[in-house]
Swiss-Prot record:
Residue ranges of every copy of the BPL/LPL catalytic domain listed in the record: 31-206
Taxonomic placement: Bacteria, Pseudomonadati, Pseudomonadota, Gammaproteobacteria, Pseudomonadales
Alphabetic keyword roster: Acyltransferase, Cytoplasm, Transferase
Protein name listed in UniProt: Octanoyltransferase
The encoding gene: lipB
Record Gene3D superfamilies: Bira Bifunctional Protein, Domain 2 (3.30.930.10)
Top class in the EC scheme: transferase
Any one of the GO BP annotations: protein modification process
């Protein structure tokens, strides 16, 4: 079992600021560096993964599109969506990529179960689904044995922008969110519960709250 998993709660932050900081954190970390999770929300943005195809961007309109270095195709981020960026030394943890994905999916399934929502993963389409509608997306990059990017859970947000794309490359894929499934919820409580489930499913001994922002990685 690993030691503490550190969490930074960064609030609403520009996507590209977070992305470039993730890259610098990953490229600069030593073998003894602690693992971190950054909890954020983003202003509206579409992100296109490495295997993304232009035809899946239907009508982006005034929402910016950012080409990024994670796996997968196009997705949407916006306020009311809880994003967790996982900067983990997966080589030290002993996880393969498929194992890591499964652990993240199980984290989300357990979190949703806390709210009485039954969710499941799909073998051929990473993410978490409720009655066939996608409630959480995953996208990772592994570099030098360390992960970055992570997960996005739809909590209480405007889902309309998902209709401007084929989410994750699937035409007509229905999207849902926790507030539609469980009623009124506190965003901050979801974040706290996600922290606990990540520590459990990623086999850490405990969690730690990290202070300070990510300006150190500018």
């Amino acid at each position: 079992m690993a030691n503490a998993l550190g969490f930074r709660d960064l609030g609403l932050i520009d996507y590209e600021t977070a992305w470039h900081a993730m890259q610098r954190f990953t490229d600069g970390r030593g073998r003894e560096a602690g693992d971190e999770v950054w909890l954020v929300q983003h202003p509206p943005v579409f992100t296109q993964g490495q295997s993304g195809k232009a035809e899946h961007l239907l009508l982006p309109g005034n929402i910016p599109v950012v080409q990024v270095d994670r796996g997968g195709q196009v997705t949407y981020h916006g306020p009311g969506q809880l994003v967790a960026y996982l900067m983990l030394d997966v080589r030290r943890l002993g996880f393969g990529v498929r194992d890591l994905v499964t652990r993240i999916e199980n984290t989300l399934i357990a979190l949703l179960a806390d709210y009485g929502v039954t969710a499941a993963a799909k073998a051929d389409a990473p993410g978490v689904y409720v009655d066939g509608a996608k409630i959480a997306s995953l996208g990772l990059r592994i570099r030098n044995g360390c992960s970055f990017h992570g997960l996005a859970l739809n909590v209480d947000m405007d889902l309309e922008p998902f209709r401007r794309i084929n989410p994750c490359g699937y035409a007509g894929l229905a999207m849902t969110q926790l507030s539609d499934q469980a009623g009124q919820i506190e965003f901050s409580e979801v974040s706290v519960r996600l922290r606990a489930q990540l520590v459990k499913h990623l086999d850490y001994a405990e969690q730690a709250t990290l202070t300070g922002g990510i300006n150190q990685y500018d």
